[in-house]
Amino acid sequence: MKIHIFLFVLFFFLVPIATRGVKCAVKDTYSCFIVRGKCRHECHDFEKPIGFCTKLNANCYM
């Protein structure tokens, strides 16, 4: 019985928390390539670091 309760808590409460990182990566990709145009390899004065585009060999968005 305790295993069923544990699985219920794990599935319904912890899984949505774990998927937030995926949504952030998708949001960063959209912001970087669609809204902002392109990624840069170096940060300039007014640019800020981003998360997912660093995996695509870029550090900042314009």
Swiss-Prot record:
MF terms (GO), sorted A to Z: CCR6 chemokine receptor binding; chemoattractant activity
Keyword Mitochondrion: no
Source organism of the structure: Pan troglodytes (Chimpanzee)
Cysteine pairings via disulfide bonds: 32-60, 39-53
InterPro entries recorded: Beta_defensin_dom
UniProtKB keywords: Antibiotic, Antimicrobial, Defensin, Disulfide bond, Secreted, Signal
Name used for this protein in its record: Beta-defensin 133
Cellular component, GO annotation: extracellular space
Protein localization: Secreted
Bilayer-spanning residue ranges: none
Keyword Signal: yes
Main location: secreted
Signal peptide: 1-21
Pfam families: Defensin_beta_2
GO annotation, biological process: cell chemotaxis; defense response to bacterium; innate immune response
